[in-house]
Amino acid sequence: MLRLIMIVTALILLAAAEPEDCSWPDEHCNLFKTGQCCDRSMSCVVKNWKTVCSAGWFS
Protein backbone atom coordinates (compact mmCIF):
# COMPACT_ATOMS: atom_id res chain seq x y z
CA MET A 1 0.00 0.00 0.00
CA LEU A 2 2.80 2.40 0.86
CA ARG A 3 4.48 1.64 -2.44
CA LEU A 4 1.28 2.52 -4.30
CA ILE A 5 1.02 5.83 -2.44
CA MET A 6 4.63 6.65 -3.32
CA ILE A 7 4.04 5.87 -7.00
CA VAL A 8 0.90 8.01 -7.11
CA THR A 9 2.70 10.87 -5.36
CA ALA A 10 5.58 10.67 -7.83
CA LEU A 11 3.17 10.73 -10.76
CA ILE A 12 1.38 13.77 -9.34
CA LEU A 13 4.66 15.62 -8.88
CA LEU A 14 5.77 14.67 -12.37
CA ALA A 15 2.48 15.84 -13.85
CA ALA A 16 2.69 19.13 -11.97
CA ALA A 17 6.09 19.87 -13.50
CA GLU A 18 4.65 20.56 -16.93
CA PRO A 19 1.34 21.78 -18.36
CA GLU A 20 -1.25 19.04 -18.58
CA ASP A 21 -3.45 18.43 -21.58
CA CYS A 22 -6.32 16.80 -19.68
CA SER A 23 -6.25 13.78 -21.95
CA TRP A 24 -7.94 11.48 -19.45
CA PRO A 25 -11.72 11.19 -19.90
CA ASP A 26 -12.44 12.15 -16.31
CA GLU A 27 -10.37 15.33 -16.40
CA HIS A 28 -11.45 18.70 -17.67
CA CYS A 29 -10.95 22.42 -17.39
CA ASN A 30 -7.38 23.28 -18.32
CA LEU A 31 -8.08 26.81 -19.48
CA PHE A 32 -5.36 28.45 -21.55
CA LYS A 33 -3.16 25.38 -20.93
CA THR A 34 -1.79 27.12 -17.84
CA GLY A 35 -3.58 25.41 -15.01
CA GLN A 36 -4.10 21.90 -13.80
CA CYS A 37 -6.59 19.29 -14.82
CA CYS A 38 -9.56 18.93 -12.52
CA ASP A 39 -11.39 15.80 -11.59
CA ARG A 40 -15.04 15.73 -12.68
CA SER A 41 -16.13 15.89 -9.04
CA MET A 42 -14.41 19.26 -8.64
CA SER A 43 -15.08 22.70 -10.02
CA CYS A 44 -12.63 24.78 -12.00
CA VAL A 45 -11.85 28.26 -10.80
CA VAL A 46 -9.64 30.79 -12.57
CA LYS A 47 -7.20 32.51 -10.24
CA ASN A 48 -4.43 34.79 -11.44
CA TRP A 49 -5.01 33.68 -15.02
CA LYS A 50 -4.56 30.04 -14.07
CA THR A 51 -7.09 27.28 -13.75
CA VAL A 52 -7.19 25.68 -10.34
CA CYS A 53 -9.38 22.92 -8.99
CA SER A 54 -11.74 23.60 -6.15
CA ALA A 55 -14.05 21.35 -4.15
CA GLY A 56 -16.65 24.11 -4.31
CA TRP A 57 -17.58 26.86 -6.73
CA PHE A 58 -15.74 29.43 -4.65
CA SER A 59 -12.43 29.08 -2.90
Swiss-Prot record:
Keywords: Disulfide bond, Knottin, Secreted, Signal, Toxin. It is found in: Secreted. The keyword Disulfide bond applies. GO terms for cellular component: extracellular region. Disulfide bonds join C22-C38, C29-C44, C37-C53. It comes from the Eukaryota. One of its GO terms (molecular function) is toxin activity. Expressed by the venom secretory cell of the spine. The spine is a cuticular structure containing a single large nucleated venom-secreting cell at its base. It is an independent unit capable of producing, storing and injecting venom. On the back of D.vulnerans caterpillars, spines are grouped together by 50 to 100 to form scoli, of which there are eight in D.vulnerans. Residues 1-17 form the signal peptide. Probable toxin. Does not induce increase in intracellular calcium in mouse DRG neurons, suggesting that it does not induce pain. The presence of a 'disulfide through disulfide knot' structurally defines this protein as a knottin. Belongs to the limacoditoxin-3 family. This is U-limacoditoxin(3)-Dv32a. The lineage of its organism: Eukaryota, Metazoa, Ecdysozoa, Arthropoda, Hexapoda.
